[in-house]
From Swiss-Prot:
SUPFAM superfamilies: Photosystem I subunits PsaA/PsaB. Phylloquinone binds at residue 671. The PsaA/B heterodimer binds the P700 chlorophyll special pair and subsequent electron acceptors. PSI consists of a core antenna complex that captures photons, and an electron transfer chain that converts photonic excitation into a charge separation. The eukaryotic PSI reaction center is composed of at least 11 subunits. It is found in: Plastid, Chloroplast thylakoid membrane. Its EC number is 1.97.1.12. This is Photosystem I P700 chlorophyll a apoprotein A2. It is a multi-pass membrane protein. Gene3D superfamilies: Photosystem I PsaA/PsaB. Keywords: 4Fe-4S, Chlorophyll, Chloroplast, Chromophore, Electron transport, Iron, Iron-sulfur, Magnesium, Membrane, Metal-binding, Oxidoreductase, Photosynthesis, Photosystem I, Plastid, Thylakoid, Transmembrane, Transmembrane helix, Transport.
Length: 734
C-alpha cells in the first residue's frame, strides 16, 4: 500500500475519514506522539527545527531591509524624519482605479505605497544606517545568515553531526554558552557597534568598512581603559542643543549616565545606551562562568538545588528532585522559556513608549501605538502557551515518586487553596470594578455626574512621586529636594531624569486619576481571571475533583457527553482554550486604555479621557465610536481616501471574527447531517460526480471545531483592532 499522509502515524494514515487530514495536521509537530520516535530523535528534530526557525527570521528581516531599500524612501526620510512619511513597500494592484492610485501615492513616491508603522526607519537611523546601499548590504548579509542556518539544520541531521542526548542535557554547558555567548558576547558586540558606528553617525561622522580601523571612537583611544581612568569616557557628552546626525552641539563622550532624553529626538541618549549594554555584557559574561563544565570548577545546578534547605521545614524537601524533573522534560523547559519570554515581550511594550530608544520614534504616534499593541498581543499568546506546556508536563513528564514532598509536589497538594484564592480575587475585582462603572454610568444617565464614585489612586501617585514626579506635591524620596537619594544622584543622572519625568512631552509616569484607577482594576480582573483559568488547567491536568486520574486521557481529550460521567470542559486543552478568550479580552482593555489616554495626550485634550473614562458609556461613545468614524467613512459617494484600506480591513476583521462563532456555537450533528446531504447531492449530480474522494467526509471533532473557532475569533479580533488603531491614529496625526 502506498504511504499516505500522515507518514508519522500509520494508525492515523489508515483512518478512512477526513479526520485523517485534520488530525494529521494537528499532530504534525507533536514529535513525541509519532511512530518509532526515540528520545534521541526527538531532541535532534527539535534542534534542527530551531535552525529552520532562525533561517525564516533572517529571511524575513532581510526582506524588510530589501523592500525598503528598493521601494522605500529611506534617504529622503533621513533628511527630515519628522515630516516625511516612511514607506514600507510599493503596492501593485491591478484593481486600483485612479482615485485609489491617488489616495495611496504618498511619501514622495511615484505610485501607490504602504506607509511603515513598524519603527524600522527610526531603528536603522539610530544605529547608524544612512543610505539605501547600507540597507542592501544588511539585506544581503542576513540572506547569507539565513542560508547558513538552513545548512546548519541539515548538517545536524546527518549521522556524523547528530548531537547525542547527553549533549542536550548538559545544563551547565548550555547555561555557559547562552549566558556568556548569546547574551554576554552579543551585548558586548552591540556596545562595540554603538560606540564605533552609531554614536559617530549621530555626530555626523560616517564610519564604514573602509575607514573603521583609522577613526578613533574617542579622542583618547584605549588609553583611559588601560590606565583605569574610565571616567574620561563620560566627559564632554552631547549638549542639550545637539542636532542628531550632525556635529552641531555634539560631544566626545561614549559611555555616559546622563538620564532622561535627547531634547531633539525625544529618545534615550545613545551614549547612555552604549553604557547600559556594556554593563549588561559584563554581568552576563561573569554569570556564564559560574557553572561547572569540563574544568571541574564552579557550581553544579543539581548540587545547588539539592543543598537548598528551606528555613523551618516549611517547604518540605524544597528543591530535591527538581533538577532531573526539569532537565528530562522539554515541556517544563519550554514552559519556563515561554513564561520568561512572555513577560519580557510585555516589558518591551511598556518600555518602548515610556523610554523610547530610537530617534524620533516618540513623535511618530501611529508607530508608537502599533508597536505597543503588537508587543502586548504577542506577550499574551506566549504567556498562555507557557501554561499549556506546563499542563502537558504534568500529563506526560511528571513523576510523583521523583518529586515527593518537594516544592512542585506541594503546589499540587495545595492547588485547591491556590485556585480558590485566585477565584476569590477575580470575583472581588470583577464585582467591585463593574459595580463602580455601572454606578457611574447610571449617575451620568440620570444627569447627576457629581454623584459618581471617583477614587484617586493615591498609592500609585505616591510611587510616581517617589520616582521624582512633583505635580502631586507628595515631597517624598526623589521628589524631595532634601533627601539623601536626591542629593546623591544630583551630579550624575538625576538632572536628566527629573527633567524628563516632569515634562509633559513624553509618556514617562503619566498623570493618573479616577479613570485610571478604574481601568487599572478592570485590567487586574482580566489578568487574575486569565491566570485562574490557566493555573487551574495546569494544576488539574493530571486529575481533579471531578476526574481524579486524567493521565491516560492526555492533554486534549474531547467532550464525551454524560454517559461516562461527562468529560466536558475538563481537559487541560479546554482550560487553555477558555484562557485565550480572557487573555484577548484583557489585552483589549489594556490597549484601549493605552491608546485612548495617549490620543488625548497627543491632541492636548487629556480632560476628555479624565472625564469620560469613569463610566462605561464614556468608553463606548468617546473612545470606540468617536474614533471609528474614519473607518466607517472609508468609502463614500466622493470616492475613497488613504484610510479606505483600513476601512475594508475593519469590515473584514469583523467578518472573520463573526465566522468564529459558527464553529463555537453549534452541534456536530448539524454539520454531519449537512455534510452527508451535500455529499449525497454531489454524488448524484452529473459532471460534479466525476470528482470523487477517498476519505469519507465527517464533521470536525469538538476539540477541532473549538480550535478553528478560537483561531477565527483571535485573528478577526486582532485584525479589527489593528485597523481601528492605525486608521484612527494616522487619521488624526498624519
Amino acid at each position: 500500500m502506498a504511504l499516505r499522509f500522515p507518514r508519522f502515524s500509520q494508525g492515523l494514515a489508515q483512518d478512512p475519514t477526513t479526520r485523517r487530514i485534520w488530525f494529521g495536521i494537528a499532530t504534525a509537530h507533536d514529535f513525541e506522539s509519532h511512530d518509532d520516535i526515540t528520545e534521541e530523535r526527538l531532541y535532534q528534530n527539535i534542534f534542527a527545527s530551531h535552525f529552520g526557525q532562525l533561517a525564516i527570521i533572517f529571511l524575513w528581516t532581510s526582506g524588510n531591509l530589501f523592500h525598503v531599500a528598493w521601494q522605500g524612501n529611506f534617504e529622503t526620510w533621513v533628511q527630515d524624519p519628522l515630516h516625511v512619511r516612511p514607506i514600507a513597500h510599493a503596492i501593485w494592484d491591478p484593481h486600483f482605479g485612479q482615485p485609489a492610485v491617488e489616495a495611496f501615492t504618498r511619501g514622495g513616491a511615484l505610485g501607490p505605497v504602504n506607509i511603515a508603522y513598524s519603527g524600522v526607519y527610526q531603528w536603522w537611523y539610530t544605529i547608524g544606517l544612512r543610505t539605501n546601499e547600507d540597507l542592501y548590504t544588511g539585506a544581503l548579509f542576513l540572506l547569507f545568515l539565513s542560508a547558513l542556518s538552513l545548512i546548519g539544520g541539515w548538517l545536524h541531521l546527518q549521522p556524523k553531526w547528530k548531537p547525542r542526548v547527553s549533549w542536550f542535557k548538559n545544563a551547565e554547558s548550555r547555561l555557559n554558552h547562552h549566558l556568556s555567548g548569546l547574551f554576554g558576547v552579543s551585548s558586548l558586540a552591540w556596545t562595540g557597534h554603538l560606540v564605533h558606528v552609531a554614536i559617530p553617525a549621530s555626530r555626523g561622522e560616517s564610519v564604514r568598512w573602509n575607514n573603521f580601523l583609522n577613526v578613533l571612537p574617542h579622542p583618547q583611544g584605549l588609553g583611559p581603559l588601560f590606565t583605569g581612568q574610565w571616567n574620561l569616557y563620560a566627559q564632554n557628552p552631547d549638549s542639550s542643543s545637539h542636532l542628531f546626525g550632525t556635529s552641531q552641539g555634539s560631544g566626545t563622550a561614549i559611555l555616559t549616565l546622563l538620564g532622561g532624553f535627547h531634547p531633539q529626538t525625544q529618545s534615550l541618549w545613545l551614549t547612555d545606551m552604549a553604557h547600559h549594554h556594556l554593563a549588561i555584557a559584563i554581568l552576563f559574561l561573569i554569570a556564564g562562568h559560574m557553572y561547572r563544565t569540563n574544568f571541574g570548577i564552579g557550581h553544579s545546578i543539581k548540587d545547588l538545588l539539592e543543598a537548598h534547605i528551606p528555613p523551618g521545614g516549611r517547604l518540605g524537601r524544597g528543591h530535591k528532585g527538581l533538577y532531573d524533573t526539569i532537565n528530562n522534560s522539554i515541556h517544563f523547559q519550554l514552559g519556563l522559556a515561554l513564561a520568561s519570554l512572555g513577560v519580557i515581550t510585555s516589558l518591551v511594550a511598556q518600555h518602548m513608549y515610556s523610554l523610547p530608544a530610537y530617534a524620533f520614534i516618540a513623535q511618530d504616534f501611529t508607530t508608537q501605538a502599533a508597536l505597543y499593541t503588537h508587543h502586548q498581543y504577542i506577550a499574551g499568546f506566549i504567556m498562555t502557551g507557557a501554561f499549556a506546556h506546563g499542563a502537558i508536563f504534568f500529563i506526560r513528564d511528571y513523576n510523583p515518586e521523583q518529586n515527593e514532598d518537594n516544592v512542585l509536589a506541594r503546589m499540587l497538594d495545595h492547588k485547591e487553596a491556590i485556585i480558590s484564592h485566585l477565584s476569590w480575587a477575580s470575583l472581588f475585582l470583577g464585582f467591585h470594578t463593574l459595580g463602580l462603572y455601572v454606578h457611574n454610568d447610571v449617575m451620568l444617565a440620570f444627569g447627576t455626574p457629581e454623584k459618581q464614585i471617583l477614587i484617586e489612586p493615591i498609592f500609585a501617585q505616591w510611587i510616581q512621586s517617589a520616582h521624582g514626579k512633583t505635580s502631586y506635591g507628595f515631597d517624598v524620596l526623589l521628589s524631595s529636594t532634601s533627601g539623601p537619594a536626591f542629593n546623591a544622584g544630583r551630579s550624575i543622572w538625576l538632572p536628566g531624569w527629573l527633567n524628563a519625568i516632569n515634562e509633559n512631552s513624553n509618556s514617562l509616569f503619566l498623570t493618573i486619576g479616577p479613570g485610571d484607577f478604574l481601568v487599572h482594576h478592570a485590567i487586574a480582573l482580566g489578568l487574575h481571571t486569565t491566570t485562574l483559568i490557566l493555573v487551574k488547567g495546569a494544576l488539574d491536568a493530571r486529575g481533579s475533583k471531578l476526574m481524579p486520574d486524567k493521565k491516560d486521557f492526555g492533554y486534549s481529550f474531547p467532550c464525551d457527553g454524560p454517559g461516562r460521567g461527562g468529560t466536558c470542559d475538563i481537559s487541560a486543552w479546554d482550560a487553555f482554550y477558555l484562557a485565550v478568550f480572557w487573555m484577548l479580552n484583557t489585552i483589549g482593555w489594556v490597549t484601549f486604555y493605552w491608546h485612548w489616554k495617549h490620543i488625548t495626550l497627543w491632541q492636548g485634550n487629556v480632560s476628555q479621557f479624565n472625564e469620560s473614562s469613569t463610566y462605561l458609556m464614556g468608553w463606548l461613545r468617546d473612545y470606540l465610536w468617536l474614533n471609528s468614524s474614519q473607518l466607517i467613512n472609508g468609502y463614500n459617494p466622493f470616492g475613497m481616501n488613504s484610510l479606505s484600506v483600513w476601512a475594508w480591513m475593519f469590515l473584514f476583521g469583523h467578518l472573520v471574527w463573526a465566522t468564529g462563532f459558527m464553529f463555537l456555537i453549534s452541534w456536530r450533528g448539524y454539520w454531519q447531517e449537512l455534510i452527508e446531504t451535500l455529499a449525497w447531492a454531489h454524488e448524484r449530480t452529473p459532471l460534479a460526480n466525476l470528482i470523487r474522494w477517498k476519505d469519507k467526509p465527517v464533521a470536525l471533532s469538538i476539540v477541532q471545531a473549538r480550535l478553528v473557532g478560537l483561531a477565527h475569533f483571535s485573528v478577526g479580533y486582532i485584525f479589527t483592532y489593528a485597523a481601528f488603531l492605525i486608521a484612527s491614529t494616522s487619521g488624526k496625526f498624519g
